[in-house]
């Protein structure tokens, strides 16, 4: 029996795949558990429409990430912090502080977890911070830390 997998089934198939499975397995397990649906003409058309919609959404998401990358790479985030001798900061600048500053000054809202910082910023001056906007798109934001 041909079925369309609605969820991932270990060893049998992934969500969205169409496969031939034994009739008993399909009727007694996959269909009853809601893990798969019978592959009829109408369900195949629905699956194709759903795949096209997902591809369209993914393309739109990628395009918006590319536009945001262009915007981010043009701007500089200004932060002020107290510092001691040699330009060392008292404390550090975290990704949360960078996000808050971007929200305040440039009205750009990002998740702090998208920032890829090995360590927090602990010195005055300019620092380039990588932001992962999409699995295929990463941007570099220039952060300027000046003395308060």
From Swiss-Prot:
InterPro entries: Ribosomal_bL9 (IPR000244), Ribosomal_bL9/RNase_H1_N (IPR009027), Ribosomal_bL9_bac/chp (IPR020594), Ribosomal_bL9_C (IPR020069), Ribosomal_bL9_C_sf (IPR036791), Ribosomal_bL9_N (IPR020070), Ribosomal_bL9_N_sf (IPR036935)
Family from the record: Belongs to the bacterial ribosomal protein bL9 family.
The gene coding this protein: rplI
SS bond partners: none
Origin: domain of life: Bacteria
Keywords from the UniProt entry: Ribonucleoprotein, Ribosomal protein, RNA-binding, rRNA-binding
MF (Gene Ontology): rRNA binding; structural constituent of ribosome
Function: Binds to the 23S rRNA.
Protein name: Large ribosomal subunit protein bL9
Gene Ontology cellular-component terms listed: ribonucleoprotein complex; ribosome
